[in-house]
Amino acid sequence: MATARLGVMRPPRSCALIFLCAFSMATAPTNATAHRRAGTVKSTPPPEDKGNYTAKYYDKNIYFNIYEGRNSTPRRRTLWEIISKFSTSEMLSLKRVKAFVPVDDNPTTTLEDIADILNYAVCDDNSCGCTIETQARIMFGDIIICVPLSADNKGVRNFKDRIMPKGLSQILSSSLGLHLSLLYGAFGSNYNSLAYMRRLKPLTAMTAIAFCPMTTKLELRQNYKVKETLCELIVSIEILKIRNNGGQTMKTLTSFAIVRKDNDGQDWETCTRFAPVNIEDILRYKRAANDTCCRHRDVQHGRRTLESSNSWTQTQYFEPWQDIVDVYVPINDTHCPNDSYVVFETLQGFEWCSRLNKNETKNYLSSVLGFRNALFETEELMETIAMRLASQILSMVGQQGTTIRDIDPAIVSALWHSLPENLTTTNIKYDIASPTHMAPALCTIFVQTGTSKERFRNAGLLMVNNIFTVQGRYTTQNMFERKEYVYKHLGQALCQDGEILFQNEGQKFCRPLTDNRTIVYTMQDQVQKPLSVTWMDFNLVISDYGRDVINNLTKSAMLARKNGPRYLQMENGPRYLQMETFISDLFRHECYQDNYYVLDKKLQMFYPTTHSNELLFIPRKLRCPHLGRNLRFPHLGRNLRFPHVGIGSY
């Protein structure tokens, strides 16, 4: 049995602020350290460590020498005793951090439960208390444990097994989901753009990155049939880990190849054609959110209810691309016939009925409901790939108890049809405040994702290139000390000499004067509601274009309603706000500052069930010239090259 011996080292004198997300940052440890070095011992009960404080590994428990507080004499503790201590004391003091870890009065905690509040750092010198570079520092409250990443023991394997799949799946699925959401105008942003990124736990993600090898590859192959056509789906993923100043970067290239294997590969796109679904079936598949529908317009129920006669043209009541939180067909309701109406419910509490046979309703259903399902399925796809990758890294392929569904070719096919022929990129950054009880620190997360397609005689290749970086915003000075933000005790960000972008139940999101692209996410001392908006609306941060479109079209609709049908016939008069026009105009992106050329991006697909997809809009072949083959990401200082792809070559 492989075992190890822990050495003793007194805690250093200095104690410095630890930036949670900075992996290479020189910091001093807090009041507790533990160290280990390789060795072997017999599997016997632990002896009393009188003068020689030695902690050991055994079959079930790992013992550590722990310095607690200012006591110079270490105490022997098992890992589970450490976690238990963290559960009973530290977690109770962290009760306000509800967005990161659920806490009750009698917490029972496992490694998986506390994974999201780890402070994890790879050491490049002795400043963090660990002796060699191959050791990693893991913090449980005020206790530091040094773990050799290459150690082949049950404790480290168990920790990797819990953290790595979770972190990698969050990175891949969240990044691609964010890319698709932004590509299609942040449609449904309440769930699927920046709010969609709430599922990403940066500390867990970076812990998983640290456990990954510097380079790794995985290839999966799966045969399937579409109408007696023999097809193959080939999924390949490559990971490259890069250390940068103050942080860590992981680059991933995921490739999907759809290949026709019979008939010499002719008409390979047959392998991408799956049966469409019916929007009414989707609505009936999901149970109603409540037992009522379309309350009578004259009855007060504590929140405003729009009349069923209201058309989608009256957008002054809501922002439809972000506010729809539930759509369903009423069941057993006398106000709305089951087979002809659908109920819409918004974040603000509006709800109303609309006829299913109206074009505006169908378009809206396809956009909002379909897009939400599309991102959900895409997220599961990338999670599946990440889990397979993590299993390979851990050398536990086929591990008993691990359930991973097969990669669905229908989802990959829908991605192929929906993404533009050109190379598309998103380059996003946002800030996250320290989620622990320590002094507040600020880290910046960069997510850069690009997609490209290439056609072959017998196959199609879809490539997703992702760069994920977390680094300290300021390596020498806390951002809050620069007075760009003022940090309140409960974790709320208050603006100082900056613009308040959004305020929700006492929580403010600020744009500092020095950076108009920053989004700050801070904890708040309240129980989070399921429909609570905790992220700033993305359209307000990136550009005002989407809001301008809505405002102009809303004015046009109101003038048209006021002046009658003849107003619509005016050559330069505002148009009536039809949903087709609304969707088309909303998904426009400027390529040039002079507005000469626009690239029309429309929602083109969704796949609400596992084995089906449907094209909602037929894409136009619009190209943005002079983009070149390389894209420069300023924060990484290098070019991202998509192989085999030339813009405008189709």
Swiss-Prot record:
The alphabetical list of record keywords is: Glycoprotein, Membrane, Signal-anchor, Transmembrane, Transmembrane helix, Viral envelope protein, Virion
Which residues get glycosylated? Answer: N52, N290, N332, N338, N359, N422, N516, N552
Provide the coiled-coil residue spans. none
Localization annotation: Virion membrane
Q: How does it sit in the membrane?
A: Single-pass type II membrane protein
Q: Which residues cross the membrane?
A: 1-32
**What post-translational modification information does the record give?**
N-Glycosylated.
> Could you name the Gene Ontology cellular component terms for this entry?
membrane; viral envelope; virion membrane
What spans does the record annotate as topological domain Virion surface, numbered to this chain? 33-650
Q: Does the keyword Ligase apply?
A: no
User: Is Magnesium given among the entry's keywords?
Assistant: no
Oligomer status and interactors: Associates with the gp82-gp105 complex.
For this entry, the protein name equals Glycoprotein 105
**Source organism per UniProt:** Human herpesvirus 6A (strain GS)
What lineage does the source organism belong to? Viruses, Duplodnaviria, Heunggongvirae, Peploviricota, Herviviricetes
